[in-house]
């Protein structure tokens, strides 16, 4: 299964959130941290954005979303092995 990486404009389009809100949520633990694509370029795995959107649509609490964020970021490390 191919892993698509979304740059910030794609993440904004998929989530409906502004840049400042995305980075605020990262600081609150409610959004996954971006991955480095080299230089100053960052992106997010598309499946993570889909999972975060699904959690919000399902009405998950902030605590549940924070747990999901930790799980998604841990999965990144397992995929790399």
How should these model regions be labeled?
Residues 28-35:
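Short, solvent-exposed alpha-helical "recognition" segments
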Residues 50-78:
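A short, Lys/Arg-enriched interface patch at domain edges and termini
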